[in-house]
Amino acid sequence: MLKTISPLISPELLKVLAEMGHGDEIIFSDAHFPAHSMGPQVIRADGLKVSDLLRAIIPLFELDSYAPPLVMMAAVEGDSLDPTVEARYRDALSLQTPCPEIVRIDRYAFYERAQKAFAIVITGECAKYGNILLKKGVTP
């Protein structure tokens, strides 16, 4: 047992976070995301909300300061976003100061980034457009 590490962070996720280098990306996805067909390592976090995992990992994870470190999927034409999803994520990420802006990219651009990600953490999140990409930075 390690002190000050949230019990929400599985040993597998902790290992992946430690193995990632600066510039590597990790996806925290909703339960509907096609993670297993994307290619990178998939970590299961069934039953957990993305916002809870973000809150747990952000004290351990330095976000990139040279490129946008937070990326979410934009709504498909004719669809709409639920603003409370981004608000929950921003609240969870607020432990990182200053908290960078969240950039939105189109669905297929997000899928391309996911295929190149270091890992995808598939959660129990059911919110529409509930996926977020984090780019790891260099510790100061």
Curated annotation (Swiss-Prot):
Its EC number is 5.1.3.29. The active site is at H22. It catalyses: alpha-L-fucose = beta-L-fucose. GO terms for biological process: fucosylation; L-fucose metabolic process. The keyword NADP does not apply. One of its GO terms (molecular function) is fucose binding. Substrate binds at D30, R107, Y129, G130, N131. Pathway: Carbohydrate metabolism; L-fucose metabolism. Coiled coil: none annotated. Keywords: Carbohydrate metabolism, Cytoplasm, Fucose metabolism, Isomerase. GO terms for cellular component: cytoplasm. Its main location: cytoplasm. It is found in: Cytoplasm. It is an enzyme of class 5 (isomerase). Involved in the anomeric conversion of L-fucose. Homodecamer. Belongs to the RbsD / FucU family. FucU mutarotase subfamily. PANTHER family: FUCOSE MUTAROTASE. This is L-fucose mutarotase. The gene is fucU.
